[in-house]
Amino acid sequence: MQTTRYRVEGKVQGVYFRASTQREAQAQGLTGWVCNCEDGAVELVATGTAQQHAKLAAWLACGPPMARVDRVIQTDEPLVLFDGFDIHY
């Protein structure tokens, strides 16, 4: 298990990115959270296996249909165990 922080930049707010990310993370069996940033990016922290993270990272590179992803930054974090995958407001 590993915990990774993702920062997704581009047109990622107002396009259902958080809700779509929550659904994708849950479908992959990841736990964690996702939130909008004040600067227009989306940030998430997720815990799961390397394979789960690889699938999520591939999805984040495109995002939902109305999004335009310019960049995804991944940072390894200390392991955190979450209950479910939440949207933070």
UniProtKB/Swiss-Prot annotation:
Q: Which Gene3D superfamilies match?
A: 3.30.70.100
Instruction: Please report the name of this protein according to its UniProt entry.
Output: Acylphosphatase
Top-level taxon of the source organism: Bacteria
Provide the E.C. number(s) assigned to this enzyme.
3.6.1.7
List UniProt keywords, sorted A-Z.
Hydrolase
Q: Which residues form the active site?
A: 18, 36
Domain Acylphosphatase-like residues, every copy: 3-89
Q: Please state which protein family the record places this protein in.
A: Belongs to the acylphosphatase family.
One Pfam entry for this protein is: Acylphosphatase
Instruction: State the organism of origin.
Output: Saccharophagus degradans (strain 2-40 / ATCC 43961 / DSM 17024)
- Fetch the PANTHER family from UniProt: ACYLPHOSPHATASE, ACYLPHOSPHATASE-RELATED
Kindly list the GO molecular function terms attached to this UniProt entry: acylphosphatase activity
Tell me what reaction this enzyme catalyses: an acyl phosphate + H2O = a carboxylate + phosphate + H(+)
Return the PROSITE patterns for the record.
ACYLPHOSPHATASE_1, ACYLPHOSPHATASE_3
Class of enzymatic activity (EC top level): hydrolase
